[in-house]
C-alpha cells in the first residue's frame, strides 16, 4: 500500500527540509523507494532551467527516482510572489494530481509544507486545508528554542481540530547554545499526543548530510501501513 506523510513545523525555519531529508533517507535505507514533494515553494529563484527552490532541490536529491523538478515542486513562487499581499490563485488540483502521480511511482512520499500549519497561501487559505482534503497523516518538526513548547502544543491542537492524526514529532536542535534542552524535550514528550521519532543535533550544512540515523521509524509502528486516513 502507498504511504504519504505531511511534514509541518512549529514555525518557519525550524528544519522541515532537513527532517524531510532525514525521513526520506531513513525510509530509503530500509529498502523502500521514496520521493520528496514540495507542493508550494516560496522564495524560489530564477535559473537557466526555470524557477528553482533550494528546499525542493534537497528533496529532489534524495528521491529514489530521477524525477523532473516540476514533479517535486509544481508551484515555485518568487520572493515577490511569496508575499500574501501578492494575490495569486493556487491550483490545488495541480497539487493533488502531482501527489497522486508520485504515489503511483514510489513506496513513500514525504510532503513538506510551507511555514507552519496555518501559514497562508497567496489566496489567503492555509495549505493545511489541502492537507485535510488529501487526508494525510502529519509529522511535526519542533525547532528547539525559547517558546517552542507553546508553539508545539498549539500546532498539535490545530492539527487535531482539523481532524487529522499527529503521528509523531521530531526535535531539531536549531540553537546549540540553548540551555535546558533536555528539560524541553522531556516536557514535550509528556505533553504531546504523539511519539518522539527522532532528534536531530545541531549540524552545519545539515541539508548536505546523511541524516537517516537520527530517525527511529520503529516509533511510527503500524502507521507505516497507512496510505491515508479514512474519513
Curated annotation (Swiss-Prot):
Return any one Pfam family short name. AAA_26
The record lists Mg(2+) as bound by 17, 55, 112
Q: Which cofactor does it need?
A: Mg(2+)
Q: What is its main location?
A: cytoplasm
- What is the top EC class of this enzyme, as a single word? ligase
Cellular component, GO annotation? cytosol
Query: Which GO annotations describe the biological process of this protein?
Result: biotin biosynthetic process
* GO molecular-function terms, A-Z: ATP binding; dethiobiotin synthase activity; magnesium ion binding
Coiled coil segments of this chain? none
Catalytic activity reads: (7R,8S)-7,8-diammoniononanoate + CO2 + ATP = (4R,5S)-dethiobiotin + ADP + phosphate + 3 H(+)
Q: Active site at which residues?
A: 38
- Annotated pathway, please? Cofactor biosynthesis; biotin biosynthesis; biotin from 7,8-diaminononanoate: step 1/2
Role this protein plays: Catalyzes a mechanistically unusual reaction, the ATP-dependent insertion of CO2 between the N7 and N8 nitrogen atoms of 7,8-diaminopelargonic acid (DAPA, also called 7,8-diammoniononanoate) to form a ureido ring.
- Quaternary structure (record): Homodimer.
NCBIfam families, per the entry: bioD (TIGR00347)
What family name appears in the similarity comment?
Belongs to the dethiobiotin synthetase family.
* Protein name, entry field: ATP-dependent dethiobiotin synthetase BioD 2
Q: Which organism is it from?
A: Salmonella typhi
